[in-house]
Amino acid sequence: MRIEEDIKLGFKDVLIRPKRSILKSRSQVNLARCFSFKYSASIWSGIPIIAANMDTIGTFEMVKSLSKFNILTAVHKYYSFEEWKNFVCLSSKEILNHVIVSIGTSNIDFLKIKKIFLLSSELKYICIDVANGYSEHIVSFLKLVRDYFPDKIICAGNVVTGEMVEELILSGADIVKVGIGPGSVCTTRVKTGVGYPQLSAIIECADAAHGLNGQIISDGGCTVSGDIAKAFGGGADFVMLGGMLSGHKECSGDIIEEKSKKYMIFYGMSSVSAMQRYEGKIAGYRASEGKTVKIPFRGGVDSTIRDILGGLRSSCTYVGAEKLKELTKRTTFIRVTEQENCIFNAFKE
């Protein structure tokens, strides 16, 4: 047993210090990024936000909406091959270029993804997704996928420490997904006592990844656009969103009406709801590590995306970053004990 004495930080623990700027308007800020990758020869350009590969968020409908903003969607792994086939046949090149195909680490997953990628050469991205990226099994599976798909852009996770980021990159990942327990409907930290505050995880993992010409995705913990700015400021190359995109018509799930108000169900992928839906039961050796919540229906996702992007542009303006790429080097974090004046929060409409 050992104790690390330095305090690790989450988004609520800091603010970004404003700096002198020559920008006259938020409209001058360019949020697009362009990345090359360690293994894949592909070049990616777009706004580096990703819809999470949760079954309620990473849907084909979400792909169609977010592709208009040049934003990626990590499509969840529970679609059948036939559903993939129908989607690919009916989708344009522009839409398919914004799809990340998510898989688990079983032999069935591997066989399925091989079939999916035969459907179109426009599919370029793979996300190997498990809750615990510290398993030797994900490393061996990653090597298998990299050998079979040498030209695809592969991300793998989730981890929260630099040494495992390095392990995954050296084993074939172009991008590593960072985050254990910060999600809005995740209870892993309280159920297991395991986790890492997200901002510190980003800072440490970005340093490890960039030293090997890799990238990271910050996965989880963002509740407002300011948190997304902090993630980019801390060194994240991409930011993955789940809860912030929930409750929209592009999400899967029924709309529930109660007392003339509409709601949607949103749940974590290790929750009772998810396990009962896909496995039929909770295995005797497992515990739920997720919540199920009922959230107000918010209509189409477009207005939410515009609000997020507007907040990001404003963040860049406050520190003088003309491009999102410049935000990290323009960011100075200050430790704080407060974030906002909450006096009227109870009166929000």
Curated annotation (Swiss-Prot):
Name of protein: GMP reductase
Primary gene name: guaC
Keyword Zinc among record annotations: no
Described purpose of this protein according to its UniProt entry: Catalyzes the irreversible NADPH-dependent deamination of GMP to IMP. It functions in the conversion of nucleobase, nucleoside and nucleotide derivatives of G to A nucleotides, and in maintaining the intracellular balance of A and G nucleotides.
Amino-acid positions noted as binding NADP(+) in the UniProt annotation, renumbered to this chain: 108-131, 216-239
A cellular component annotation (GO) from this entry: cytosol
Transmembrane segments: none
Subunit structure, as described in the record: Homotetramer.
Residues forming the catalytic site: C186
Enzyme nomenclature, EC number: 1.7.1.7
A single MF term (Gene Ontology): metal ion binding
Binding site for K(+): G181, G183
Keyword Metal-binding set for record: yes
HAMAP family with a match to the protein in the record: GMP_reduct_type1 (MF_00596)
